[in-house]
């Protein structure tokens, strides 16, 4: 597997400060469109329901911008999020705090409380680091052990197709960051954008 650390981010839950765990007010539980988001969202949903809390299922609502917009607009009460995304929520990508999970958590927790009245709950011991993986046979045949090797191989015309989420293809801290850092550019024909795709 070829991988590089771009942003550090612990998994935390974002909840509206006014989250009313009252039977009369169902808790609107959301998640992102990806499989991981759906799994985490369903865990939240089941935990709340097992404690007698009424819920509204908004699992797999959309991409990060869609879900973020929903919680800031009051359309969601809770969803799982990675602290590193705070860099983009607050247009503060160059702050070194985002490269440290604990510092990033403290920063986004403070900013969201002040600016959006959102509360970040205690983070889970999880990490969401963007990576690019290649098949073992491709790596062995072409001597690919790093992203620098992959870049050099691509620049020589290596036959490559990347399957990735729309977010990985679009977000500035994902594929565009890899392309910039390692000096390669994938053509549209080399990209297979998974569910919820936004073509570039």
Language-model features and meaning:
Residues 102-161:
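A conserved helix-loop-strand patch within extracytoplasmic ligand-binding domains
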Residues 19-23:
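Sec/Tat signal peptide C-region and signal peptidase I cleavage site
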Residues 60-64, 74-87, 104, 165, ...:
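Beta->alpha turn/N-cap motifs
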Residues 8-18:
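Bacterial N-terminal signal peptides
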């Amino acid at each position: 597997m070829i991988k590089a650390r771009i942003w550090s981010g612990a998994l935390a839950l974002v909840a509206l400060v006014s989250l009313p765990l009252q039977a009369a007010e169902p808790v609107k539980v959301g998640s992102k469109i990806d499989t991981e988001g759906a799994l985490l969202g369903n865990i939240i949903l089941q935990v709340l329901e097992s404690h007698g809390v009424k819920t509204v299922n908004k699992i797999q609502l959309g991409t990060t911008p869609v879900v973020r917009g929903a919680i800031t607009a009051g359309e969601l009460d809770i969803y799982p999020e990675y602290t590193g995304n705070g860099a983009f929520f607050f247009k503060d990508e160059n702050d070194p705090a985002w490269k440290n999970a604990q510092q990033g958590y403290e920063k986004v927790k403070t900013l969201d409380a002040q600016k959006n009245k959102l509360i970040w709950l205690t983070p889970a011991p999880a990490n969401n680091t963007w990576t690019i993986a290649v098949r073992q046979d491709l790596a062995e045949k072409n001597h690919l052990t790093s992203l620098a090797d992959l870049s050099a191989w691509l620049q020589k015309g290596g036959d490559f197709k990347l399957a990735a989420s729309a977010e990985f293809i679009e977000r500035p801290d994902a594929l565009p960051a890899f392309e910039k850092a390692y000096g390669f550019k994938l053509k549209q024909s080399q990209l297979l954008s998974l569910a919820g795709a936004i073509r570039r």
